[in-house]
């Protein structure tokens, strides 16, 4: 029963969509109707710029941190892992927004940095490096998620942590499936390209 409660609580924390809330109350727009249609920090950056995206990113990261800490407090590491997956699912598919959310990258950053700060930092650094070199946020996001999973193979923790890392990477990749198509076709937007608000 504790596992179910932790999962539900973490999911509901994830459902607090900061991109939607911030843009709705500061600009009176639904961010999902602009740019990529994604309710996340990257799309806020694309549509409204870095000043608007920064608080959204920070709050999304904090969602992951809070959920994992709550899960760990109640059940230990198994609870942290369950909460980590659940909070990302809540961000991606929020019940309050008809399951149209973000891609879970910023929240995943908070999750992995709380579960394993060292491996999380390495994965984050590699992901940021890819973004800096290619200017593709989507490619850097997927690279970071995959890197975290691979690091847990080469520097093994428990089977549970490895399974968690793989599932998290798959969630990130799944949410970027349209980006993958655009990357292949050469039509993916690069960081710095602004979308117009009609």
UniProtKB/Swiss-Prot annotation:
MF (Gene Ontology): acyl-phosphate glycerol-3-phosphate acyltransferase activity
InterPro entries with a match to the protein in the record: G3P_acylTferase_PlsY
Transmembrane segments: 3-23, 65-85, 111-131, 153-173
Biological pathway: Lipid metabolism; phospholipid metabolism
Role according to the record: Catalyzes the transfer of an acyl group from acyl-phosphate (acyl-PO(4)) to glycerol-3-phosphate (G3P) to form lysophosphatidic acid (LPA). This enzyme utilizes acyl-phosphate as fatty acyl donor, but not acyl-CoA or acyl-ACP.
Sequence similarity: Belongs to the PlsY family.
Name of this chain's protein: Glycerol-3-phosphate acyltransferase
Organism: Caldanaerobacter subterraneus subsp. tengcongensis (strain DSM 15242 / JCM 11007 / NBRC 100824 / MB4)
Taxonomy of the source species: Bacteria, Bacillati, Bacillota, Clostridia, Thermoanaerobacterales
Encoding gene, per UniProt annotation: plsY
